[in-house]
Structures are given as structure tokens and as C-alpha cells.
A protein has these predicted regions:
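Formylglycine-dependent sulfatase
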Residues: 1-198
Length: 198
């Protein structure tokens, strides 16, 4: 459980010091491998994978400490905008996810052709849906903004959020970067497109 391992936000990466499901499976003789994003502290830690193929972990083992769930929240030194680019295109994260998906398909084909019938686990991690909100056009075209409703529970419409959510929004909130509802809808469409992309 997250309260036992202390990894409940993007600030604290899992380091394997408390055994997880992967270690337990390895201990029983199972083959356990990963392809793609894990977002753990380091590939060098005993996180429960016999092999990590093209892993993505926390940069230098440190997460977004400023966004940690703590009292009080840290102040950001400058406005932090995650929506610098929204719309059709191909980001480096999209390329990474495609590479991970292709590697997983090849891994599964090789496994199917193997005579080894021992149990195995393959975990495949993707970055999407994640900022930047950029998706290949064939996926973005699936979500015309005129068909997307605006969020129902929005403070600009009088909705009262939980105080904790208000505090978090004051630290890393992004909605105030949008000048128009059309921009909000473009962001929602791009997010949905990234979900379909995955």
C-alpha cells in the first residue's frame, strides 16, 4: 500500500526497499520484465523486474518535490505552464510510447514462439496521456471540440471546490492559463486523443 512504501505522489519514487509485487513474483521463480515508463527512482534499484527494457524513471532519481503532498505546499518560483503546446503533432513522448508498444509486441511474439512454458509477467508502461498535450492528428480528429462538453464542476460557474483542491490549484493549477473556453476544449480534445493513442 502507498502509505506503507511512501510513494503516493510524483515526488517520491519507488526504490524497492519495501518488496513489491515484482519481487514477490521473482522470489517464486517467475520471469518479470518491463518495457517503457516506470517512473521509479532508478533502474539500479531492486524494484522487481528481472529486466527493464528502455525504462523511463525519475530524472536523477528525484521527482517533483515542489508538488509533493505536504503541509504547507511549496511555492513555485515562477509560473509553471504545462500547456505550452496543445494540438496535433508528434512529441518525443509519443515516439517513446510507440517504441515501447512495438517492443512489447516483439517481446510477446518471441515469448509465444518460445518452448519455455514457465509463467511470466510483462509490464508495459506508457507516458501518455501526459503533457505536452500533443497527439497525432488521426487521434485528435476523433474529438471535434464542438462535440466536447466543458467541465460541469468549475469554479467560474460557482462550484465550490474542496479547500485542499483549491490549495493545490493555487500551487500548480493550470486553468488560469486559458483565456477562452475554446482553449480548454482543445486541451480536453488533445487529452482524449492521447488516451486513444495509447
Amino acid at each position: 500500500h502507498v502509505h506503507e512504501i511512501g510513494c503516493w505522489d510524483n515526488a517520491h519514487g519507488y526504490d524497492g526497499s519495501i518488496p513489491g509485487w515484482g519481487q514477490r513474483l521473482i522470489d517464486t521463480g517467475h520471469r518479470v520484465e518491463s518495457i517503457g515508463k516506470l517512473h521509479y527512482k532508478s533502474a539500479d534499484d531492486p524494484t522487481g523486474f528481472s529486466v527493464q527494457h528502455s525504462p523511463m524513471h525519475l530524472k536523477q532519481g528525484v521527482g517533483t518535490v515542489w508538488g509533493a503532498i505536504k503541509e504547507p505546499f511549496a511555492d513555485l518560483p515562477e509560473p509553471w505552464r504545462m500547456f505550452n503546446k496543445i494540438g496535433a503533432g508528434v512529441s518525443n513522448y509519443n515516439l517513446y510510447d510507440r517504441k515501447s508498444a512495438n517492443a512489447a509486441c516483439e517481446w510477446l511474439k518471441a515469448r509465444a514462439a518460445s518452448a519455455d512454458d514457465k509463467p511470466w509477467v510483462l509490464y508495459v508502461g506508457f507516458v501518455a496521456p501526459h503533457y505536452p498535450l500533443v497527439a497525432p492528428s488521426q487521434f485528435l480528429d476523433m474529438y471535434p471540440i464542438e462535440d466536447i462538453p466543458l467541465p460541469k464542476l468549475h469554479p467560474k460557474d460557482g462550484y465550490k471546490r474542496h479547500p485542499w483542491v483549491d490549495t493545490l490549484d493555487g500551487v500548480i493549477g493550470q486553468d488560469h492559463f486559458f483565456n477562452r473556453d475554446e482553449e480548454r476544449l482543445q486541451a480536453i480534445a488533445a487529452y482524449l486523443a492521447l488516451c486513444s493513442f495509447v
